Amino acid sequence: MPSAIVAAEQYREIFLNQHPMMDVRAPIEFTRGAFPNSTNLPLMLDSEREKVGTCYKQFGQQAAIALGHSLVNGPIKQQRIEAWASYVKANPNAYLYCFRGGLRSQLTQQWLKEAGIEVPYIQGGYKAMRQYLIGVIEAAPTQQPLLSLSGMTGCGKTDFLLQRKEAVDLEGIANHRGSSFGKNIDPQPTQINFENQLAIALLRHQQDNHSCLLLEDESFLIGRSALPQSFYSAMQAAEILVLEEPDDTRLKRLRNEYVHKMYSGFCERLGLEAGFAAFSEYLLQSLMSIRKRLGGKQHQELQDLMQQALNQQISQNDTSLHLVWIHLLLHKYYDPMYQYQLQKKSERVLFKGSHQAMHEWLNNFKSTQ
């Protein structure tokens, strides 16, 4: 028979082993932030939780508990128990948790036990596990050397990182490619979920005992996902590797990312007509987001070129004109901005080179650690 309570010392194992977890908090709590491999099967729905909370403030704990039992009773109670039982049947090693590992966890566990099902609940609940993950992020930069991978837009930093076992892909976790055109079709995670997933990725990285932690040289915001301040500060002090690629390679890579992949993704999701409309809006809105920094005249020039490229794409199935506005965007906006930023931190640059040269340098760095 499993232990009735999962101790805080097991948090690391829970996250590393992707342990299935039953989150019995209300849906509104789950939506704000949750853990990977958790499923929301609430003891109380949002409206029920709100009523119990109001009762607690006005009349105290015992009255609130009594109200909770009256709200979740009879057929409603039976439906909740059946949903939990079904989850446990599919996930026999599941744990459960509420916000603090208190009454909701204990009551859920008790009702399941009365139905003949033993499920341990996690000590401290969501709040304690969340604090644990925040601690992981804060400690990570002190665990091993931190290296920051930089390079001009389109040089393939993400492609490179995905080939390196010592790397953590921040943009993948944020579901955003970092630039003004970096939005993906699916939405970004909530800020809390971004931080939780980052912490778990760092836990896995530490488990594998790598020679360094390799990250892309990101801004504080990746789309709308904010890097935790202490982690970002450590990144700002890290030594830098600069990835270099020919302009032609960068252009074609960006056309593939901004145009081919996004167009295909929108069409798969929405169909050809609606997909092209959504794809066009994505490009034009991305350009609009940097209008102030471009200036009105330069923005208008790029917008006209972009519209011409879209017209040719839809009429002739030809994406070659997209290279024109991408080239202009690189050389009038992204490249000067990057060069200015790199110059300010040039004293931290350890190495510059191509993909192959960078792999060789990192392999050698690994062997010397």
Curated annotation (Swiss-Prot):
Keywords: Selenium, Transferase. Gene3D superfamilies: Rhodanese-like domain (3.40.250.10). InterPro entries: Rhodanese-like_dom (IPR001763), Rhodanese-like_dom_sf (IPR036873), SelU (IPR017582). Residues 15-138 form the Rhodanese domain. Its EC number is 2.9.1.3. One of its GO terms (molecular function) is tRNA 2-selenouridine synthase activity. It is an enzyme of class 2 (transferase). PROSITE patterns: RHODANESE_3. The keyword Plastid does not apply. It catalyses: 5-methylaminomethyl-2-thiouridine(34) in tRNA + selenophosphate + (2E)-geranyl diphosphate + H2O + H(+) = 5-methylaminomethyl-2-selenouridine(34) in tRNA + (2E)-thiogeraniol + phosphate + diphosphate; 5-methylaminomethyl-2-thiouridine(34) in tRNA + (2E)-geranyl diphosphate = 5-methylaminomethyl-S-(2E)-geranyl-thiouridine(34) in tRNA + diphosphate; 5-methylaminomethyl-S-(2E)-geranyl-thiouridine(34) in tRNA + selenophosphate + H(+) = 5-methylaminomethyl-2-(Se-phospho)selenouridine(34) in tRNA + (2E)-thiogeraniol; 5-methylaminomethyl-2-(Se-phospho)selenouridine(34) in tRNA + H2O = 5-methylaminomethyl-2-selenouridine(34) in tRNA + phosphate. The active site is at C98 (s-selanylcysteine intermediate). One of its GO terms (biological process) is tRNA wobble uridine modification. The keyword Transferase applies. PANTHER family: TRNA 2-SELENOURIDINE SYNTHASE. NCBIfam families: PRK11784.1-2, PRK11784.1-3, tRNA_sel_U_synt. Monomer. Belongs to the SelU family. Involved in the post-transcriptional modification of the uridine at the wobble position (U34) of tRNA(Lys), tRNA(Glu) and tRNA(Gln). Catalyzes the conversion of 2-thiouridine (S2U-RNA) to 2-selenouridine (Se2U-RNA). Acts in a two-step process involving geranylation of 2-thiouridine (S2U) to S-geranyl-2-thiouridine (geS2U) and subsequent selenation of the latter derivative to 2-selenouridine (Se2U) in the tRNA chain. This is tRNA 2-selenouridine synthase.
